[in-house]
Amino acid sequence: MEMLIKNAVVVSPADKLNEKTDILIKDGVIAEIGNGITSDGEIIDADGLCAVPGFVDMHVHLRDPGQTHKEDIITGCRAAAAGGVTSLLAMPNTNPTTDSPEIVKYILDKAKDADSRVYVAASVTKGLKSEEPTDIDAVKSAGAIALTDDGRPVENTKYLSDAMKKAPKLGMTIVAHCEDLFLADGGKINEGEVSEKLGVKGIPAGAEDCGTAREIALAAALNEPIHICHVSTKTSVALIRDAKRRGVKVTAETAPHYVSLTDRELLRGDADYRMNPPLRTQADVDEIINGLCDGTLDAVATDHAPHTPEEKADFVKAPNGSIGMETSFAVCNTYLVKTGRMTLSQLVEKMSVNPARILKINAGTLSVGANADVVLINPDEEWTVDVNKLHGKSKNTPFKGRTLTGKVKKTILGGKIVFSD
């Protein structure tokens, strides 16, 4: 099977490409990139569009198994495709927890028919309880590529340390949710002016910062790598920046909502703006953007966390989390590229190249022989987020009703069109 993409501006920083050219796809892989290519296969005229390597979202909650009323593997990957996400890392806070070979295999088997490539993160500890370590060899053999207790920190530092020493030998990535639960103390939103005004218990920024400091200290002491999730505070950015200067093997991600929204959104009393870590202050947002631009923060990942409208109905009692895969590119393009803080090529590094490198997966490139995971985007098209037109089961997006710039027009997975706008 052949497919020829004509006249696209190919933006692939891993391949040092940023030019108008053609892409020939054969049998699911990139066969040729150049001008004047001809083919008897399907022709896509991409004049006016950019072609980028499929986005890699390294932080996704698919809710499958156990919470499939919120999302499942098939619907989650449908949402991924609509957002240009062709590879994703599924978090282990499922029910049962992804802490056994059986659950890893269940996810991978179900994902074979999905519209995105699904990679699995198993838990560091059984049931995310920090009471007993997961059998890392067993989950690795079943196909897991990463380890995390995301949704909560690994409270037992010895178990985290042991996992950090073992994971590199198996080619696995340790992904750390940084939070001091004693400091967080059941808070619901960022501690500060807004929480005081609403009379809602806050989570101090220090809860995240203490967790970040612990993980960096471990990585430094062990001389082993660690990846830090969903960075939301200016102090965590400073800690990571300093650690990188000292040669600590730390990488980090933030999420689209942390570069675009502040805790003032919570004044609406809408739980779709509640996530963990919570939305912070404008000073935090500014420093998150600085961290992305100067390389302190390596990646953008959504922390896609679906919940039903019923679950999100009560502002204080609602679970944390928001969906994000369908809006991720548009939000980052709007708030980072269109504001002049970074180029489209630099954004592709954060959304494709670096996540693939951190996870050690075959993605983030359009080089000859690579998987033909290609996204056609119009970086200048404006659109308004309509929750009724989203592709997943849940609608809890903090960007509902917002007009964004940058639209995914087609998503190609292994040479097959899985989404078309």
Model-based region annotation:
Residues K105, P133-V300:
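Histidine/acidic residue-rich metal-binding segments in metalloenzymes
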Residues D109-V124:
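A glycine-rich helix N-cap at a beta->alpha junction
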Residues M1-T38:
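N-terminal metal-binding scaffold of metallo-dependent hydrolase/deaminase domains
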Residues D314, N371-D421:
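C-terminal cap of metal-dependent C-N hydrolases
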Residues L49-A111:
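Metal-associated gating/positioning segment near the N- to mid-region
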Residues A8, I23, G28, G48, ...:
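Divalent metal-coordination and catalytic microenvironments
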Residues K197-P225, D272, D294, D298-V300, ...:
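His/Asp/Glu-enriched, well-ordered alpha-helical/loop segment
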Residues G36-A51:
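Active-site metal-binding motif and surrounding structural segment of the metallo-beta-lactamase
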